């Protein structure tokens, strides 16, 4: 049985590895040090949506975790997408806690994480890496890139 966060949305399958051609190698734990939280600040651009928040301090260069979802072509990519070299990882219908990382635009002057692609056994893995210290309780943010907003 896969252990998922207690407040995980019921309409999204929780996975913490990529789904590729129907095969999954599912680990049975959640990403540590983070919590999904509904944004309750009415002044926030993402009010009423979800965000990912630190439950511990993260230092610059820490790896928060691997972004997971279904491997798809760039052509079929949706809105919850991280890009690799020739493919994308779409977490719209399945993924892990990292799918709730919001863009820093209109929230913070700069993101506190970035996406980095690394290779394990010649397979790409999309990782979220801390770019500046994140304090406990702080929202985890990244830049979706200019093309997302065009």
Go through each PLM region and give its residues.
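C-terminal SET catalytic tail plus cysteine-rich post-SET Zn-binding segment of SAM-dependent SET-domain
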Residues: 2-10, 105-150
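Catalytic cores of histone-lysine modification enzymes
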Residues: 4, 8-112
């Amino acid at each position: 049985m896969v252990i998922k966060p207690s407040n995980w949305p019921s309409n999204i399958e929780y996975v913490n590895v990529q789904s590729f051609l129907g095969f999954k190698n599912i680990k049975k734990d959640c990403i540590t040090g983070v919590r999904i939280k509904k944004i309750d600040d009415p002044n926030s651009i993402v009010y009423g949506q979800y965000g990912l928040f630190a439950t511990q301090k993260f230092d610059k260069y820490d790896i928060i975790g691997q972004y997971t979802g279904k491997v798809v072509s760039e052509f079929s990519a949706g809105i919850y997408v991280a890009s690799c070299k020739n493919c994308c990882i779409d977490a719209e219908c399945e993924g892990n806690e990292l799918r709730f990382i919001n863009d820093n635009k209109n929230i913070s002057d700069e993101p506190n994480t970035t996406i980095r692609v690394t290779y394990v056994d010649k397979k790409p893995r999309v990782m979220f890496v801390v770019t500046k210290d994140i304090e406990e309780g702080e929202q985890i943010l990244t830049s979706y890139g200019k093309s997302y907003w065009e």
